[in-house]
Amino acid sequence: MKIVKISPRGYCYGVVDAMVIARNAALDTSLPRPIYILGMIVHNKHVTDAFEEDGIITLDGPSRLDILDKIDSGTVIFTAHGVSPEVKQRAKEKGLTTIDATCPDVTKTHDLIEAKKAEGYHVIYIGKKNHPEPEGAVGIAPDIVHLIEKADDLKTLEIPTNKILVTNQTTMSQWDVQHLMEDIQKKFPTAEFHKEICLATQVRQEAVAKQADVADLTIVVGDPKSNNSNRLAQVSQEIAGTKAYRVADVSEIKLEWLQGVENVAVTAGASTPTPITKEVIAFLEQYDPMNPATWERVRKVPLQKILPRVKVKKEQ
Protein backbone atom coordinates (compact mmCIF):
# COMPACT_ATOMS: atom_id res chain seq x y z
CA MET A 1 0.00 0.00 0.00
CA LYS A 2 1.33 3.42 -0.97
CA ILE A 3 0.83 6.32 1.46
CA VAL A 4 0.39 9.84 0.08
CA LYS A 5 1.43 12.18 2.90
CA ILE A 6 -0.40 15.36 1.99
CA SER A 7 1.60 18.49 2.73
CA PRO A 8 1.08 20.88 4.37
CA ARG A 9 -1.01 19.27 7.09
CA GLY A 10 -1.54 19.55 10.83
CA TYR A 11 -0.89 22.37 13.29
CA CYS A 12 -1.24 26.01 12.22
CA TYR A 13 0.48 28.90 14.00
CA GLY A 14 -2.72 30.06 15.72
CA VAL A 15 -3.19 26.65 17.32
CA VAL A 16 0.45 26.42 18.42
CA ASP A 17 0.33 29.95 19.87
CA ALA A 18 -2.85 29.16 21.84
CA MET A 19 -1.35 25.96 23.23
CA VAL A 20 1.89 27.70 24.22
CA ILE A 21 -0.11 30.42 25.98
CA ALA A 22 -2.07 27.79 27.93
CA ARG A 23 1.08 25.77 28.71
CA ASN A 24 2.82 28.87 30.06
CA ALA A 25 -0.25 29.60 32.18
CA ALA A 26 -0.05 26.11 33.69
CA LEU A 27 3.58 26.75 34.67
CA ASP A 28 2.95 30.26 36.04
CA THR A 29 2.57 29.85 39.80
CA SER A 30 1.55 33.51 40.20
CA LEU A 31 -1.78 32.98 38.41
CA PRO A 32 -4.87 32.45 40.59
CA ARG A 33 -6.06 28.86 40.69
CA PRO A 34 -7.95 27.00 39.41
CA ILE A 35 -7.14 27.70 35.75
CA TYR A 36 -10.00 27.11 33.31
CA ILE A 37 -10.19 27.08 29.53
CA LEU A 38 -13.47 28.55 28.28
CA GLY A 39 -14.35 25.73 25.88
CA MET A 40 -11.78 23.57 24.08
CA ILE A 41 -8.54 25.57 23.63
CA VAL A 42 -8.47 24.02 20.17
CA HIS A 43 -10.90 21.43 18.87
CA ASN A 44 -9.01 18.28 19.78
CA LYS A 45 -9.80 16.07 22.77
CA HIS A 46 -6.27 14.69 22.96
CA VAL A 47 -5.07 18.25 23.56
CA THR A 48 -7.68 19.01 26.23
CA ASP A 49 -6.89 15.71 27.98
CA ALA A 50 -3.20 16.61 27.97
CA PHE A 51 -3.95 20.02 29.49
CA GLU A 52 -6.03 18.33 32.18
CA GLU A 53 -2.90 16.39 33.16
CA ASP A 54 -1.21 19.80 33.41
CA GLY A 55 -3.88 20.91 35.88
CA ILE A 56 -5.89 23.05 33.46
CA ILE A 57 -9.64 22.41 33.46
CA THR A 58 -11.55 22.55 30.17
CA LEU A 59 -15.19 23.56 30.58
CA ASP A 60 -17.73 23.31 27.78
CA GLY A 61 -21.31 24.41 27.32
CA PRO A 62 -23.82 25.85 24.85
CA SER A 63 -22.19 29.30 24.94
CA ARG A 64 -19.21 31.08 26.48
CA LEU A 65 -21.52 33.03 28.79
CA ASP A 66 -23.09 29.79 30.02
CA ILE A 67 -19.64 28.38 30.74
CA LEU A 68 -18.64 31.51 32.66
CA ASP A 69 -21.62 30.99 34.96
CA LYS A 70 -19.86 27.84 36.24
CA ILE A 71 -16.76 29.80 37.31
CA ASP A 72 -16.54 31.85 40.50
CA SER A 73 -12.80 32.36 40.92
CA GLY A 74 -9.42 31.74 39.38
CA THR A 75 -8.04 32.27 35.88
CA VAL A 76 -9.87 31.92 32.58
CA ILE A 77 -8.22 31.32 29.20
CA PHE A 78 -10.14 32.43 26.11
CA THR A 79 -9.67 29.93 23.28
CA ALA A 80 -8.24 30.41 19.78
CA HIS A 81 -11.80 30.82 18.46
CA GLY A 82 -12.27 34.23 20.13
CA VAL A 83 -14.98 35.58 22.43
CA SER A 84 -17.44 38.46 22.40
CA PRO A 85 -16.97 41.73 24.34
CA GLU A 86 -19.85 40.62 26.58
CA VAL A 87 -17.89 37.54 27.66
CA LYS A 88 -14.82 39.65 28.44
CA GLN A 89 -16.93 42.10 30.45
CA ARG A 90 -18.67 39.30 32.38
CA ALA A 91 -15.31 37.78 33.31
CA LYS A 92 -14.10 41.18 34.50
CA GLU A 93 -17.23 41.69 36.61
CA LYS A 94 -16.65 38.31 38.25
CA GLY A 95 -13.12 39.33 39.19
CA LEU A 96 -11.49 36.60 37.12
CA THR A 97 -7.96 36.81 35.77
CA THR A 98 -8.18 36.43 31.99
CA ILE A 99 -5.71 35.26 29.34
CA ASP A 100 -6.58 35.74 25.68
CA ALA A 101 -5.41 33.02 23.26
CA THR A 102 -7.53 34.23 20.33
CA CYS A 103 -6.02 33.47 16.92
CA PRO A 104 -4.77 36.68 15.24
CA ASP A 105 -6.80 35.86 12.12
CA VAL A 106 -9.98 35.77 14.23
CA THR A 107 -9.05 39.06 15.90
CA LYS A 108 -8.65 40.61 12.45
CA THR A 109 -12.24 39.64 11.59
CA HIS A 110 -13.51 41.06 14.90
CA ASP A 111 -11.71 44.35 14.19
CA LEU A 112 -13.23 44.46 10.71
CA ILE A 113 -16.76 43.99 12.08
CA GLU A 114 -16.24 46.76 14.65
CA ALA A 115 -14.91 49.14 12.00
CA LYS A 116 -17.80 48.48 9.63
CA LYS A 117 -20.36 48.88 12.40
CA ALA A 118 -18.93 52.34 13.08
CA GLU A 119 -19.51 53.16 9.40
CA GLY A 120 -23.17 52.14 9.57
CA TYR A 121 -22.87 48.74 7.90
CA HIS A 122 -24.70 45.50 8.52
CA VAL A 123 -22.60 42.33 8.34
CA ILE A 124 -23.50 38.97 6.80
CA TYR A 125 -21.28 36.40 8.50
CA ILE A 126 -20.93 32.96 6.88
CA GLY A 127 -20.26 30.34 9.53
CA LYS A 128 -21.32 27.18 11.32
CA LYS A 129 -24.15 27.59 13.80
CA ASN A 130 -23.28 26.50 17.35
CA HIS A 131 -19.54 26.88 16.67
CA PRO A 132 -17.56 29.13 19.06
CA GLU A 133 -15.89 31.24 16.35
CA PRO A 134 -19.16 32.56 14.87
CA GLU A 135 -20.51 32.99 18.40
CA GLY A 136 -17.66 35.37 19.19
CA ALA A 137 -17.92 37.21 15.86
CA VAL A 138 -21.68 37.71 16.08
CA GLY A 139 -21.19 38.87 19.66
CA ILE A 140 -19.03 41.79 18.48
CA ALA A 141 -22.19 43.53 17.23
CA PRO A 142 -25.23 41.23 17.58
CA ASP A 143 -27.64 43.93 16.43
CA ILE A 144 -26.06 44.18 12.96
CA VAL A 145 -24.34 40.80 12.35
CA HIS A 146 -26.43 38.15 10.57
CA LEU A 147 -25.15 34.55 10.73
CA ILE A 148 -25.87 32.33 7.74
CA GLU A 149 -24.70 28.77 7.17
CA LYS A 150 -26.58 27.66 4.06
CA ALA A 151 -28.22 29.17 1.00
CA ASP A 152 -31.65 28.57 2.58
CA ASP A 153 -30.74 31.04 5.35
CA LEU A 154 -30.65 33.79 2.72
CA LYS A 155 -34.29 33.37 1.74
CA THR A 156 -35.64 35.03 4.86
CA LEU A 157 -32.77 37.47 5.38
CA GLU A 158 -33.77 41.12 5.08
CA ILE A 159 -31.32 43.95 5.75
CA PRO A 160 -32.50 47.57 6.15
CA THR A 161 -29.53 49.17 4.37
CA ASN A 162 -27.45 48.92 1.20
CA LYS A 163 -24.26 49.17 3.27
CA ILE A 164 -23.47 45.48 3.70
CA LEU A 165 -20.23 43.68 4.47
CA VAL A 166 -19.91 39.93 3.89
CA THR A 167 -17.26 37.96 5.75
CA ASN A 168 -16.86 34.47 7.17
CA GLN A 169 -15.57 31.99 9.72
CA THR A 170 -11.87 31.42 9.08
CA THR A 171 -12.07 27.60 8.96
CA MET A 172 -14.85 27.20 6.39
CA SER A 173 -14.39 25.42 3.07
CA GLN A 174 -13.30 28.12 0.64
CA TRP A 175 -15.53 26.56 -2.03
CA ASP A 176 -18.61 26.66 0.22
CA VAL A 177 -17.88 30.28 1.09
CA GLN A 178 -17.44 31.20 -2.57
CA HIS A 179 -20.79 29.64 -3.54
CA LEU A 180 -22.60 31.42 -0.71
CA MET A 181 -20.95 34.73 -1.56
CA GLU A 182 -22.17 34.38 -5.14
CA ASP A 183 -25.72 33.80 -3.86
CA ILE A 184 -25.43 36.80 -1.54
CA GLN A 185 -24.24 39.03 -4.36
CA LYS A 186 -27.33 38.16 -6.38
CA LYS A 187 -29.64 39.16 -3.52
CA PHE A 188 -27.56 42.10 -2.22
CA PRO A 189 -25.66 43.52 -5.24
CA THR A 190 -24.19 46.43 -3.23
CA ALA A 191 -22.52 44.13 -0.70
CA GLU A 192 -18.77 44.30 -0.07
CA PHE A 193 -16.91 41.02 0.30
CA HIS A 194 -14.00 40.21 2.60
CA LYS A 195 -13.17 36.50 2.36
CA GLU A 196 -11.45 35.62 5.63
CA ILE A 197 -10.41 31.99 5.11
CA CYS A 198 -7.16 31.86 7.06
CA LEU A 199 -4.06 31.06 5.02
CA ALA A 200 -3.36 27.85 6.95
CA THR A 201 -6.89 26.57 6.29
CA GLN A 202 -6.70 27.59 2.64
CA VAL A 203 -3.37 25.92 1.84
CA ARG A 204 -4.39 22.72 3.63
CA GLN A 205 -7.63 22.57 1.65
CA GLU A 206 -5.83 23.27 -1.63
CA ALA A 207 -3.25 20.58 -0.83
CA VAL A 208 -6.03 18.01 -0.39
CA ALA A 209 -7.75 19.18 -3.58
CA LYS A 210 -4.53 18.78 -5.60
CA GLN A 211 -2.88 15.77 -3.95
CA ALA A 212 -5.73 13.47 -2.87
CA ASP A 213 -7.00 12.83 -6.40
CA VAL A 214 -4.32 10.15 -6.97
CA ALA A 215 -5.49 8.16 -3.93
CA ASP A 216 -8.25 5.59 -3.56
CA LEU A 217 -9.01 6.82 -0.05
CA THR A 218 -8.24 9.84 2.14
CA ILE A 219 -7.91 9.62 5.90
CA VAL A 220 -8.21 12.95 7.71
CA VAL A 221 -6.86 12.89 11.25
CA GLY A 222 -8.86 15.30 13.37
CA ASP A 223 -11.36 15.69 16.19
CA PRO A 224 -15.08 15.38 15.35
CA LYS A 225 -15.58 18.93 16.67
CA SER A 226 -12.84 20.33 14.44
CA ASN A 227 -14.55 22.24 11.64
CA ASN A 228 -11.38 22.53 9.56
CA SER A 229 -10.81 18.75 9.81
CA ASN A 230 -14.35 18.00 8.69
CA ARG A 231 -13.94 20.44 5.81
CA LEU A 232 -10.77 18.62 4.66
CA ALA A 233 -12.77 15.40 4.35
CA GLN A 234 -15.42 17.34 2.42
CA VAL A 235 -12.79 18.80 0.06
CA SER A 236 -11.37 15.34 -0.62
CA GLN A 237 -14.78 13.99 -1.59
CA GLU A 238 -16.26 16.99 -3.40
CA ILE A 239 -13.18 18.55 -5.05
CA ALA A 240 -10.61 15.74 -5.37
CA GLY A 241 -13.26 13.07 -5.91
CA THR A 242 -11.69 10.72 -3.36
CA LYS A 243 -13.69 9.02 -0.62
CA ALA A 244 -12.65 10.28 2.81
CA TYR A 245 -13.00 9.36 6.45
CA ARG A 246 -12.15 11.51 9.45
CA VAL A 247 -10.63 9.75 12.46
CA ALA A 248 -9.65 11.15 15.85
CA ASP A 249 -6.67 8.76 15.98
CA VAL A 250 -5.47 5.37 14.76
CA SER A 251 -7.99 3.48 16.92
CA GLU A 252 -10.89 4.70 14.75
CA ILE A 253 -9.59 3.29 11.46
CA LYS A 254 -11.81 0.47 10.20
CA LEU A 255 -10.08 -2.31 8.29
CA GLU A 256 -12.93 -2.61 5.78
CA TRP A 257 -12.05 0.88 4.52
CA LEU A 258 -8.69 -0.51 3.36
CA GLN A 259 -10.02 -3.48 1.40
CA GLY A 260 -8.80 -3.27 -2.21
CA VAL A 261 -7.12 0.08 -1.56
CA GLU A 262 -3.68 0.62 -3.10
CA ASN A 263 -3.13 4.33 -2.41
CA VAL A 264 -4.14 6.11 0.81
CA ALA A 265 -3.80 9.87 1.27
CA VAL A 266 -3.33 11.15 4.82
CA THR A 267 -3.81 14.68 6.07
CA ALA A 268 -4.62 16.29 9.40
CA GLY A 269 -6.61 19.22 10.73
CA ALA A 270 -4.94 22.36 12.02
CA SER A 271 -5.63 21.33 15.63
CA THR A 272 -4.38 17.73 15.33
CA PRO A 273 -1.23 16.83 17.31
CA THR A 274 1.60 15.71 15.03
CA PRO A 275 2.35 12.51 17.03
CA ILE A 276 -1.27 11.38 16.55
CA THR A 277 -0.96 11.80 12.77
CA LYS A 278 2.43 10.06 12.68
CA GLU A 279 0.90 7.08 14.47
CA VAL A 280 -1.80 6.81 11.79
CA ILE A 281 0.81 6.95 9.02
CA ALA A 282 2.98 4.36 10.78
CA PHE A 283 0.03 1.96 11.03
CA LEU A 284 -0.81 2.32 7.34
CA GLU A 285 2.82 1.86 6.28
CA GLN A 286 3.11 -1.49 8.07
CA TYR A 287 -0.44 -2.71 7.36
CA ASP A 288 -0.72 -5.99 5.46
CA PRO A 289 -4.25 -7.27 4.75
CA MET A 290 -2.88 -10.85 4.77
CA ASN A 291 -1.11 -10.53 8.14
CA PRO A 292 -3.32 -10.15 11.24
CA ALA A 293 -0.26 -9.17 13.28
CA THR A 294 -0.36 -5.79 11.47
CA TRP A 295 -4.01 -5.06 12.18
CA GLU A 296 -3.75 -3.63 15.71
CA ARG A 297 -5.09 -0.08 15.97
CA VAL A 298 -4.45 1.25 19.47
CA ARG A 299 -3.42 4.82 20.29
CA LYS A 300 -0.16 4.61 22.19
CA VAL A 301 0.99 8.24 22.04
CA PRO A 302 1.40 9.42 25.66
CA LEU A 303 -0.43 12.62 26.55
CA GLN A 304 2.81 14.31 27.63
CA LYS A 305 3.95 14.10 23.98
CA ILE A 306 0.89 16.05 22.79
CA LEU A 307 1.63 19.54 24.09
CA PRO A 308 4.37 21.87 22.80
CA ARG A 309 7.48 22.29 24.89
CA VAL A 310 7.94 25.62 26.62
CA LYS A 311 10.83 27.04 28.57
CA VAL A 312 10.26 27.52 32.27
CA LYS A 313 11.07 31.11 33.19
CA LYS A 314 13.64 31.36 35.95
CA GLU A 315 12.80 33.64 38.86
CA GLN A 316 14.99 36.71 39.05
UniProtKB/Swiss-Prot annotation:
(2E)-4-hydroxy-3-methylbut-2-enyl diphosphate binds at residues 43, 81, 131, 170, 226, 228, 271. Keywords: 4Fe-4S, Iron, Iron-sulfur, Isoprene biosynthesis, Metal-binding, Oxidoreductase. Pfam families: LYTB. It is an enzyme of class 1 (oxidoreductase). InterPro entries: LytB/IspH. The active site is at residue 133. Pathway: Isoprenoid biosynthesis; dimethylallyl diphosphate biosynthesis; dimethylallyl diphosphate from (2E)-4-hydroxy-3-methylbutenyl diphosphate: step 1/1; Isoprenoid biosynthesis; isopentenyl diphosphate biosynthesis via DXP pathway; isopentenyl diphosphate from 1-deoxy-D-xylulose 5-phosphate: step 6/6. Binds 1 [4Fe-4S] cluster per subunit. Its EC number is 1.17.7.4. Disulfide bonds: none annotated. Isopentenyl diphosphate binds at residues 43, 81, 131, 226, 228, 271. [4Fe-4S] cluster binds at residues 12, 103, 198. Its cofactor is [4Fe-4S] cluster. PANTHER family: 4-HYDROXY-3-METHYLBUT-2-ENYL DIPHOSPHATE REDUCTASE (PTHR30426:SF0). Catalyzes the conversion of 1-hydroxy-2-methyl-2-(E)-butenyl 4-diphosphate (HMBPP) into a mixture of isopentenyl diphosphate (IPP) and dimethylallyl diphosphate (DMAPP). Acts in the terminal step of the DOXP/MEP pathway for isoprenoid precursor biosynthesis. Belongs to the IspH family. This is 4-hydroxy-3-methylbut-2-enyl diphosphate reductase.
